[in-house]
Amino acid sequence: MTEITALEAVAAIEAGTLTSETLVRGYLDRIAERDDVVKAWVHLDPDQAIAQAKAADAASGGLLRGIPVGVKDIIDTYDMPTGHNSPIFEGKVPFGDAACVALCRTANAVIMGKTVTTEFANRHAGATTNPHNPAHTPGGSSSGSAAAVADGHVPLAFGTQTGGSVIRPAAYCGVVGYKPTFGDFSRVGIKMQCHSVDTLGLMARTLDDIALFRAAVLKLPIVHIDRDIGRPRIGICRSPVWDQAEPETKALIEATATLLSDKGASVVDVAFSAPFTDIIDDHAAITGFESVRNYADERLRNPDMVSEELMNGPMKRGLVVSFERYVVAQRKATAFKAYVDSLFDKVDLLLTPSAPGEAPKGLAATGDPVFNSIWTLAGTPCVTLPAGTGPDGLPLGVQLVGLRHDDDRVLSLAAWVAAHLN
């Protein structure tokens, strides 16, 4: 039952061959069986989930009718605590839902519970493990959401991305992760870290489910994946940080490019030109400057309740970024977005790593967002697809980057790639 896709489940519920209650109970059984190891959930109330499922069964219609959704614990829910993995907010229930959660409820979804996040969606890790090997990180900061989808606890889950917090954990856990064009999804009711780049993202096991989920969050009719979109023009973008990729990741990107070329795609090399070869430093300047100010209350009023890792790491670094440096970085980011847009005059997708390698061993850190931050700054839609395994038998992903505000087409092009990867 937990292997069914969200799209299939909605169709079955609408047809009367499946009930949401049956579906939700199946997922709850899976969670009871596995979450002592995976530790994906910080708040889960089975009775509340079943009550929502019964209400969905009694209702009619809705893009997500009866479908369980996991919600990262920096996203507000009026009927559940939103704790941000911080003692400052432990047990506190917001006054209302985040816009994305409210829109899911409007679509008759079941808000299953809250998934583990790193502290304030930053570096200090939570308890979640990688479902493929609990000795390894699931990635972060959307740790619980990625692990929950990968381990069959829910078919859909929300993440957020400031650096690489959707794409990287999705890749580490072997699921599909999608970061939309910056600004497409409302951020109302989501803990703000960096207002220039913070982006709500989605995780699922299939691109069809991502398309369904996207439509619900936008409150629009679903734009189904176009299976006849044709052969894409693909640019291999090793990016300025290619030297930080592990050998298995470099080999995967090269092998994927060869495979897609053999299947009929046009494949060319794409390299960054000056002055954008150090653009990752500008992402760091912008996020450092903004985050230390957006966390002002936590930092100044409750410093003893902020982790040392956050207080003496990102916050300390952010305090030394001058306003002049911030302005320079913002101006460069504006130019960079236009530059990246221009790359799509000649290609439809960029092929690039989702992460440096497979999920690192240990739970104290969640991996490096070095292959994600530049695209988050560019505001482009990004998709990670499971594409192989590394030397420890853990998932490897490939990242596909598309033109801003062309997300529906990007998802269809990604489906062409996925069909040949599989």
Where on the chain are the PLM-derived regions?
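An N-terminal boundary/leader segment
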Residues: 1-44, 48, 262-264, 325, ...
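Glycine-rich, small-residue loops and helix-cap segments
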Residues: 16, 66, 72, 106, ...
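Acyltransferase
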Residues: 17-25, 54-57, 247-271, 295-302, ...
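Residue-level signal for inorganic ion chemistry
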Residues: 27, 49, 210, 234, ...
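Structural helix-boundary/capping segments
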Residues: 33, 106, 151-156, 160-243, ...
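Long amphipathic alpha-helix in the N-terminal Rossmann-like dinucleotide-binding domain
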Residues: 49-54, 108-109
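Short helix-loop capping/hinge segments that flank enzyme active sites or metal/cofactor-binding pockets
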Residues: 64-84, 231-233, 285-341, 386-397
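Short glycine/serine-rich loop/turn segments
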Residues: 65-198, 239, 353-366
